[in-house]
């Protein structure tokens, strides 16, 4: 898959995820105790055989840069890389990124590789597992200029999505951002559930196709769309316009997918991972989630009751502690007889002595 270049968008200010984003960007926020959110799209790329990856960053990016530098190091011979493109002022432009599309436009000089046929545009703040080779297969079989990943959703959920309308071949004909009424859905973007069922996915009452924010562009198509316009955002501007001018196809996806854009969604997604029947399985040998190896000691437990929880490395948990339905991050020290439930402990970057904690 050396002809595919992946571009991961590092996200904006992350105001809806504040205070978790007070000192770090959204993709750098910890996930499931030991990972960072950015590990998800990067792992998806690597598991799909796509190892040429650029990460576009701007806000609070020091922690994210450090994580990428320490984690993703490839040998010199396979041509793979995960490289950071930080926002910068240049002779051509003195403004910062104004949106997702503008971020890619400002980096086209770095992205214009002659050996690249496709650009895969990804968000850096989503939790899901996808084989992008299937997306590429849909793109090539349909002769698409642009292919977008689409997830079937209910009408209630559609109010939080950009919803697309497709014809029988899967070509996208219309798009509506966050429809608020059944009338809007019926008249503009409803998808026949039978069409979804016919493609091997059970519709289960879902008659809307939501935009997942995952786009595959032909190389020249993306460059042309960005250079001949001043569009700032992929979802709100580039994608709707490309529907009118190019062959845009939908690629159906029916796995677990969560946009971790708010404190509530972050909390709920983490706690879902602690369940025995978690909808997203971290323990997947065929498609593992990669992250930084910290070489911490095993967690020490002493007469502890643990139920439906994730405990990271390097923790010390005192006798009689009870931990239920919770995530415990790296290097946490939990005292005797402490009870923790339905909680997320973010962990620590270093150990503190008893004297330091008392100060």
Q: What is each model feature region?
A:
Residues 129-216, 229:
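Conserved core of the sugar-phosphate nucleotidyltransferase
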Residues 12, 125, 262:
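Active-site glycine-centered loops adjacent to acidic/histidine catalytic or metal-binding residues
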Residues 28, 163-166, 250:
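A structural signal for short hydrophobic beta-strand segments in well-ordered beta-sheet cores
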Residues 9, 122-123, 218, 253:
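A secondary-structure boundary/capping signal
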Residues 72-80, 168-174, 181-186, 275-282:
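Proline-centered turn/helix-capping motifs that create local helix->coil transitions or kinks
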Residues 1-5, 194-205, 219-359:
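Left-handed beta-helix
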Residues 1-8, 16-22, 30-138, 166-167:
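Conserved N-terminal catalytic core of the sugar/cofactor nucleotidyltransferase
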């Amino acid at each position: 898959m050396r002809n595919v270049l992946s571009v991961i968008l590092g996200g904006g200010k992350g105001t809806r995820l504040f205070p978790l984003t007070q000192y770090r960007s959204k993709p750098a926020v910890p996930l499931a105790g030991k990972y960072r959110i950015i590990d998800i799209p990067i792992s998806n790329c690597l598991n799909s055989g796509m190892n040429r990856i650029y990460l576009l960053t701007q806000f609070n990016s020091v922690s994210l840069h450090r994580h990428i530098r320490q984690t993703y190091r490839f040998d010199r011979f396979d041509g793979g890389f995960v490289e950071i493109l930080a926002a910068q002022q240049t002779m051509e432009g003195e403004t910062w990124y104004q949106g997702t599309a503008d971020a890619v436009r400002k980096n086209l000089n770095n992205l214009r590789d002659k050996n690249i046929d496709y650009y895969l545009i990804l968000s850096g703040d989503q939790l899901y597992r996808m084989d992008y080779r299937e997306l590429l297969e849909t793109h090539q079989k349909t002769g698409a200029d642009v292919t977008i990943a689409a997830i079937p959703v209910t009408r209630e959920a559609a109010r939080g999505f950009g919803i697309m309308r497709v014809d029988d071949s899967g070509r996208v004909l219309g798009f509506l951002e966050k429809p608020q009424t059944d009338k809007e859905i019926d008249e503009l973007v409803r998808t026949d559930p039978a069409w979804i069922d016919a493609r091997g996915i059970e519709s289960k009452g879902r008659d809307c196709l939501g935009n997942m924010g995952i786009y595959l562009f032909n190389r020249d198509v993306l460059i042309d769309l960005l250079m001949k316009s001043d569009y700032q955002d992929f979802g709100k501007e580039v994608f709707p316009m490309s529907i009118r001018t190019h062959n845009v196809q939908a690629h159906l996806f029916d796995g677990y997918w969560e946009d971790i854009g708010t404190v509530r969604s972050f909390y709920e997604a983490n706690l879902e991972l602690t369940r025995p029947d978690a909808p997203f399985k971290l323990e997947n040998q065929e498609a593992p989630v990669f992250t930084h190896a910290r070489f911490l000691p095993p967690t020490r437990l002493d007469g502890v009751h643990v139920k439906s929880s994730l405990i990271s490395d390097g923790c010390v948990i005192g006798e009689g502690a009870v931990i239920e339905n919770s995530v415990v991050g790296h290097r946490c020290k939990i005292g005797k007889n402490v009870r923790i439930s339905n909680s997320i402990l973010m962990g620590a970057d270093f150990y503190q002595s008893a004297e330091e904690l008392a100060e």
